[in-house]
Amino acid sequence: MKSKRFFLIFFLITAITEAIIVSLNYYFDYYGVFHTDETVVKSNTLNDRFVKVKRVLNNSVSLGCTSFLWGSSRVLKMDTKITGENTYNLGAPAGMTEDCIEQINIFINNGIKIDTVYIGLDDCSYYRDYSAISNNLSWISYKDELNRDIETYSCYLLMPSNVKRVIEEKGKLQGINYLGENGMFSVPYQIEENIEKNVVKYVKDPQFLVPTIYNKNPIEFERCLDNLREISEICKKHKIKMKIFFNPQHMTTYLADDMELMNRFKKELVKISSFWDFSGVNYVTANNYFWYETSHPRAFICDKILDTVSGQNKITWVPDFGVYVTPDNVDAFCEKAVRDREAYDPDHEQWIPTAEERAIMIKRVNYPW
């Protein structure tokens, strides 16, 4: 009798504990997967791969998107209104070409019309092992398959650590995710405000001396190119325009990168499609003012990239930024990149824009709307 009573009490305590954990996880929704109908979400931990795809599928008529942007956290801040099309930002932390293939097929299979795909690439596109990303619960994809998606929901509901994280991170700066508009992530305004308070001090921050380095997986190099070939074939089959661009790298990171491998990748990439390249030595990559750290350019720079790639060219204040690489100029382009890097002086004086110049840049107002 005592043992039965013990097990009954144990079972009840366990059940109540699990019920509390499930309820709290659903309520706090650390990864945003249970409240995808919200149009604006404040979160730094949103699972973009899951939430955005579900959002597009469930709201394809109201969103009316016929154009989509894929890429890593470097494209998350891009305001897709700039494209002049109804474009949805499907960028995700460590977003890779595998995400694009999976999601574009889901959309096509669900009858969503696609006119244009924008694909943002960077060094992590051909460095990082996607299996480590796809197995990370923070980044797991929406599969549009009932059994697999229910399994994901269950994992999120039953994780006590999520409740702990919500408590620990309460009060921290939260970015705004415009899920109901265009999927863009907006950096907390305090971050931009703090930069502008003392620009002279900011550009001398020691963080800009530390390169961003990824673990290299040699398999991913060919895998990334194979993925892009497959995406290109999908686009040709369904009469979709494909626009590829290579994101800028802060010079500290660029100097630490494998130049030979990067140029080899670009020479293979151009066989698949011509592309815009914003990396290399230029006005933006060489000046700390345009960066949050040595990995992510500031939001208004992200907008300029998309403005150029989409062909709108409404943002005109950024000089010497972006080269259109084709099979005809790729060899000369790569050779010049090597020469420019060898000639670059990392100790050059940092350019600091005037207050008037900064006012034009950071307002993000030179748009066609």
Task: State where each predicted segment sits.
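Hydrophobic membrane-insertion alpha-helices, especially the h-region
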Residues: L8-Y26
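Alpha-helical transmembrane signal-anchor/signal-peptide segments
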Residues: Y27-V51
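Short extracytoplasmic
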Residues: S43-L69
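N-terminal post-signal-peptidase region of extra-cytosolic proteins
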Residues: R49-V56, T97-N105, D226
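Membrane-embedded segments
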Residues: G64, L69-T152
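Secreted/periplasmic serine-hydrolase-like ester/acetyl group-modifying domain
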Residues: L121, Y130-K236, F321-W369
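Flexible, glycine-rich surface segments
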Residues: Y202-Y289
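C-terminal regions of proteins
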Residues: D258, N263-W369
